[in-house]
UniProtKB/Swiss-Prot annotation:
This is Chaperone protein DnaK. Residues 570-600 are annotated as: Disordered. InterPro entries: ATPase_NBD, Chaperone_DnaK, Heat_shock_70_CS, HSP70_C_sf, HSP70_peptide-bd_sf, Hsp_70_fam. One of its GO terms (molecular function) is ATP binding. Pfam families: HSP70 (PF00012). Belongs to the heat shock protein 70 family. It comes from Mesomycoplasma hyopneumoniae (strain 232) (Mycoplasma hyopneumoniae). It comes from the Bacteria. The keyword Chaperone applies. Acts as a chaperone. Residues 583-600 have a biased composition (Basic and acidic residues). Induction: By stress conditions e.g. heat shock.
Amino acid sequence: MAKEIILGIDLGTTNSVVAIIENQKPVVLENPNGKRTTPSVVAFKNNEEIVGDAAKRQLETNPEAIASIKRLMGTDKTVRANERDYKPEEISAKILAYLKEYAEKKIGHKVTKAVITVPAYFDNAQREATKNAGKIAGLQVERIINEPTAAALAFGLDKTEKEMKVLVYDLGGGTFDVSVLELSGGTFEVLSTSGDNHLGGDDWDNEIVNWLVKKIKEVYDFDPKSDKMALTRLKEEAEKTKINLSNQSVSTVSLPFLGMGKNGPINVELELKRSEFEKMTAHLIDRTRKPIVDALKQAKIEASDLDEVLLVGGSTRMPAVQSMIEHTLNKKPNRSINPDEVVAIGAAIQGGVLAGEISDVLLLDVTPLTLGIETLGGIATPLIPRNTTIPVTKSQIFSTAEDNQTEVTISVVQGERQLAADNKMLGRFNLSGIEAAPRGLPQIEVSFSIDVNGITTVSAKDKKTGKEQTITIKNTSTLSEEEINKMIQEAEENREADALKKDKIETTVRAEGLINQLEKSITDQGEKIDPKQKELLEKQIQELKDLLKEDKTDELKLKLDQIEAAAQSFAQATAQQANTSESDPKADDSNTIDAEIKQD
């Protein structure tokens, strides 16, 4: 019986790679064209599906050639081709099926399992879409892992005993990511992520294309943009030129018979110096600098704390990129691993771990933003803080906001702001059938669970009746890495203002709760209360109501402290008078949070 093989797949925006573990070592598989990377492009022509290199060559000439489909994963958008609409996961599935097919030919038997990588900032919807793409392609996706984690895994395979902090600089074809990880005893933990979802190697290619168009117009009096085939050749030559300039100081651009001019065929022969190229792309290099600083800040470490800097993505071969990294971090980046293949290698290693081929390696990823629920007053109460290691499950006891409330609404939010309205709403569901009781008595356990693939499940359970409701968060919209970083930055900028708002809301909720409690005591105790005590209670209630109207938080806090102390003395006296040791069930439960779930 053939040994189980789990494919390691880097499903990239621009290119994809597949690798396996062979004799306990990772091996990258070549496609039918003898290349180790395959363009993530699908084209349709005459009812025929074309994937990879051949499809890429049709990008400018065939309107039904589809690239960068990864950007649409997890959305409800579709692409039109072959006289029908395709969902993003259907197109991704065709790329995966192509990788699976040529992998099986290399291996010699069928393969049904895979580990697929995704950007660290991919949300639930994007991860689910990736799993679905694998399923459509005939693959059981054993694990979804973050790309920087995969890169660190590839790097750390033989160094599992050494503790180190690593920065992964990932400049892909269409996206840019920076991650800081901690490696220790075979464990890989993501400490932070940052980046730019709309920056990649393609932008450097486009700068060369723009330069070529301008030069060809000047020298040959010909506009290559007027000819789709000429533009396709220009883009191919631009990529080659970028690659050449990573290894040499000058590159010759040779494009014979690019088109027809006034005096016959246009034969282009131009030279581009590395110094010119670096000057025209300096602004792109600068755009990658800030995410490096941000990632270090989020991880709460200095550049001097880094043991290694890893490069991912073919564009990291550019000397200007390496020079900027070294200058920014005062450390030479590690160039010992192939930047095009490292992510797929890491995925293959994880596949080897799952198949039992490799041991002593443990992966720990983190959630990029805080997850919580909306509680009374619009407060965002966190359950799983940002950068919590996954998989994870966390629970908290909440209660009702109104007397005899039989239903609560659980609103799940994501973000760093202290008020729910300022964060992203992920989902909402109702828990019905709660036994009618005074506010604060029912115990509702809210649990958040994030699995190894980063998929979030939220449940709410009434501990007395056993009624339970559960949802899996599947976002209809996605968060780009820029949006994640923006949310973190906004939370930092608004921290003081948000804290004041939260303090005001919490004080108001506290006052309203005390008013409710005191009024209930007067009603329940009735004639048993000493008239003077009753008069004092009513006076205190009115004072609280007046301060609530006046919007004076500090004064309200002082009054609350005074009245709560008096109320406690009153409660003790009443208890002694009634000769009972019975106490407030809520007060005895140290696990019940002092914030009720908002009632819709």
